[in-house]
């Protein structure tokens, strides 16, 4: 039997609000918060969004999956 593609894939989550203010204009920040995690491709086919702590914004923000 042949194995299919891996079900679990590694994804990178990036802060949605780092470097942006309410008008969508970029601002000076020291960096962008990123997390590396895994997701199950069968259970979560869409992009992953998790609320994580951003050390640059110094608060909990929504982190979204970035394309590789």
Curated annotation (Swiss-Prot):
Gene Ontology MF, one: structural constituent of ribosome
Keyword Secreted annotated: no
InterPro entries for this protein: Ribosomal_bL33, Ribosomal_bL33_CS, Ribosomal_bL33_sf, Ribosomal_zn-bd
Any coiled-coil regions, as ranges: none
Sorted UniProt keywords: Chloroplast, Plastid, Ribonucleoprotein, Ribosomal protein
GO cellular component, one term: ribonucleoprotein complex
Pfam families: Ribosomal_L33
GO biological process: translation
Subcellular localization: Plastid, Chloroplast
Listed HAMAP family: Ribosomal_bL33
Protein name, entry field: Large ribosomal subunit protein bL33c
Native organism: Lemna minor (Common duckweed)
């Amino acid at each position: 039997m042949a194995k299919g593609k891996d079900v679990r894939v590694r994804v990178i989550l990036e802060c949605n609000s780092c470097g942006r203010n309410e008008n969508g204009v970029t601002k000076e920040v020291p960096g962008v918060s990123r997390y590396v995690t895994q997701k199950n491709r069968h259970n979560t086919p869409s992009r992953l969004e998790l609320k994580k702590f951003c050390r640059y914004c110094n608060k909990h923000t929504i982190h979204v999956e970035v394309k590789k």
